[in-house]
Amino acid sequence: MPVTDAIAQSLPIIAVSNLIKQFGRFAALRGVDAEFCVGKFYVILGDNGAGKTTLLRALAGLAHPTRGTISIQGKTPQEACRKIGYMAHPSLLYDEMSGIENLRYFARLYDIAGDERCEEVIRAVGLDPEMARAVGQYSQGMRQRMSLARAILHDPKILLLDEPFSNVDVHSAREMVGLLKGMRDAGKTILVVTHQAALLEGVADEFVWMQSGQIVERTREPGGEHSGAGTR
């Protein structure tokens, strides 16, 4: 029987079981259990130190669990790395290169030939691919947009974005939200760590609240029981 779009979007693309991550005696993640489904937009909220970034890094394959498992359609994050686009905070860009030079470098890692895709994603985030200025001379908002371009360059199925709207003006942030909404509508799974939940109200499918290394609440709206945390 064929899998319909509705059925596909109810299937988990990411499954996390009893995820623990310790740094010495400090437990950044304390037994996280969660599933994230195909084509859904999730916002991860919580105070600083709640474990949000550590969870995102673990899902991206950059923080190895002390205990527990992460399955991305039956594979580890490392095995599924080409399905994942990760935007770090602060950004992972080469300051001495221009934006297009940065993307050319990463395009080679993904076996993407030519400049067409690089130019496409730069325009998609509202920047000019002809801009010769080195990334080190960008404003913080421009760096964030170029970091998003890097994350979507290889057309991943999953986007893991850490504070994508930090230091971005409201108009540009709304443009970025519109781009992400379109990608979600096209079937991508998106997880965003942010302190700006209001930007994503009416766009996100679910708000995931973290506290002391655990997921403590999942809601359809940003005003959950723990809404005082991580939304400022």
Model-assigned labels for residue ranges:
Residues 45-47:
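The feature captures the beta-strand-to-loop junction immediately N-terminal to the Walker
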Residues 60:
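Helix-to-loop junction immediately C-terminal to a conserved catalytic motif
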Residues 68-80:
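Conserved ABC transporter NBD signature motif
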Residues 159-162:
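Catalytic Walker B motif of ABC-type/P-loop ATPase nucleotide-binding domains
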Residues 104, 115-130:
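Conserved ABC ATPase "signature" region
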Residues 194-195:
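H-loop/switch region of ABC-family ATPase nucleotide-binding domains
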